[in-house]
Amino acid sequence: MSQLNIHLKLKIVENKAFLTAEKFSMTDKVAYAEGSVVSKIIIRNERGNITLFAFDKDEFLSEHTAPYDAIVQVLDGKAEIIIDGETFELSVGESIIMPANVRHAVVAVEQFKMLLTMIK
């Protein structure tokens, strides 16, 4: 019988480990904190990043721009995503693309979690 060797790449992020061959729930990997926005980087490299966020109700990311397109996927709760002055209300399971170099902001209508993916 041959021996099977399994090698897992380990990503250490904010003192949390993400195994590349491990099943997990996105919503369980980031917790709400009262009066805060919590973020956990899942992957960050020269090609882009994937980050989880948990927003307490009424918390926000102020208006800013990013040099690359980014997609927001709502995992829990509701949020308003403001893109170039237009407001979009998103709920669980909904997504939106924020275009590169266009002003945008994120506001938690209630507690909500999102996955942000930005590819360079």
Descriptions of predicted regions:
Residues 75-76, 91-92, 110:
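A cytosolic small-molecule/anion-sensing beta-strand core signal
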Residues 35-36, 50-66:
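Conserved short histidine dyad/triad with adjacent acidic residue
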Residues 85-100:
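Short acidic-glycine-tyrosine-enriched beta hairpin
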Residues 68-80, 84:
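Glycine- and acidic-residue-biased ligand/ion/polar-headgroup-sensing regions
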Residues 1-47, 82:
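A short, N-terminal "cap"/entry segment at the start of jelly-roll beta-barrel domains
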Residues 49, 78-80, 87, 103, ...:
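Structural motif
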Residues 100-120:
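Ligand-binding loop in jelly-roll beta-barrel domains
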